[in-house]
Amino acid sequence: MFEINPVNNCIQDLTERSDVLRGYLDYDAKKERLEEVNAELEQPDVWNEPERAQALGKERSSLEAVVDTLDQMKQGLEDVSGLLELAVEADDEETFNEAVAELDALEEKLAQLEFRRMFSGEYDSADCYLDIQAGSGGTEAQDWASMLERMYLRWAESRGFKTEIIEESEGEVAGIKSVTIKISGDYAYGWLRTETGVHRLVRKSPFDSGGRRHTSFSSAFVYPEVDDDIDIEINPADLRIDVYRASGAGGQHVNRTESAVRITHIPTGIVTQCQNDRSQHKNKDQAMKQMKAKLYELEMQKKNAEKQAMEDNKSDIGWGSQIRSYVLDDSRIKDLRTGVETRNTQAVLDGSLDQFIEASLKAGL
């Protein structure tokens, strides 16, 4: 005989949590909007305005993630209840186990949707840029920056996000000096925004013939892609624009002409660059878009810093402080803000970052 009461309690709990989410996520309004968006996308002339069509497609995906999941929850809970009734009537343990397995899957799906409540920021749903910069330390630091690049690319791939290398500067011997990656997907910035900061690596260096232990640092900076109509004033006199021949990853096909563009915002020292297109004009547009996004993020960070009375250390506003330590010799990676720790270092370097990201988001960082 099997225990039916705990399963019924679980069904009731999931039903109540699902109802709470329907209200919190404004299910009715989203369902109505989804119908409107679908109708617009079915219009034959919708692709006469490609940018609007793409925006509608992205909005549809975001709406479906809520509406479809809640619809599936409702139907799934009804199906599980039906299976349980059959299992009890027939005293069939196999059917009972099938119902329990389906219930576990529904609970996991609901937990993922509940996690969206963490994404309450204005730009959490936006695509984002990730800048990785090697610290001082030459080849060792540049190799570490390359390892971080691979880690974030693997993480993005695992979440189904699209990635694009906007600019990459190769290291002198190995690794990279810097890279800018555009990451596109549902709540890309919301997921990654707490990753801004300094990442510390401790390991026996493969570049040291004596096999000595080295400590290296690389910085990550995450900022959202902002709408073109966002009100950010940039004085053209504050910008220095340089063009140069592209080289390295993302630029192999354009290195015969000075198509790469670097823009420096003189008052803040912020630099953006792009070399992934044959057209200098397109590279300049992309670099300006990044500049706008970086200045917006800087302004938001300044406001947050003021709230926390941290104006005395403005250097932390741009890059943040040390957030995570990767000690490979001891097989230990620890988040210094949340205390989350793991010994499965290879899995993390292969992109298994969710435990760290989820903990930092739940902590409200």
UniProtKB/Swiss-Prot annotation:
<dbReference type="Pfam" id="PF03462">
    <property type="entry name" value="PCRF"/>
</dbReference>
<dbReference type="InterPro" id="IPR004374">
    <property type="entry name" value="PrfB"/>
</dbReference>
<dbReference type="InterPro" id="IPR045853">
    <property type="entry name" value="Pep_chain_release_fac_I_sf"/>
</dbReference>
<dbReference type="InterPro" id="IPR000352">
    <property type="entry name" value="Pep_chain_release_fac_I"/>
</dbReference>
<dbReference type="InterPro" id="IPR005139">
    <property type="entry name" value="PCRF"/>
</dbReference>
<keyword id="KW-0648">Protein biosynthesis</keyword>
<dbReference type="Pfam" id="PF00472">
    <property type="entry name" value="RF-1"/>
</dbReference>
<protein>
    <recommendedName>
        <fullName>Peptide chain release factor 2</fullName>
    </recommendedName>
</protein>
<dbReference type="GO" id="GO:0016149">
    <property type="term" value="F:translation release factor activity, codon specific"/>
</dbReference>
<comment type="function">
    <text>Peptide chain release factor 2 directs the termination of translation in response to the peptide chain termination codons UGA and UAA.</text>
</comment>
<feature type="modified residue" description="N5-methylglutamine">
    <location>
        <position position="252"/>
    </location>
</feature>
<keyword id="KW-0488">Methylation</keyword>
<dbReference type="GO" id="GO:0005737">
    <property type="term" value="C:cytoplasm"/>
</dbReference>
<comment type="similarity">
    <text>Belongs to the prokaryotic/mitochondrial release factor family.</text>
</comment>
<keyword id="KW-0963">Cytoplasm</keyword>
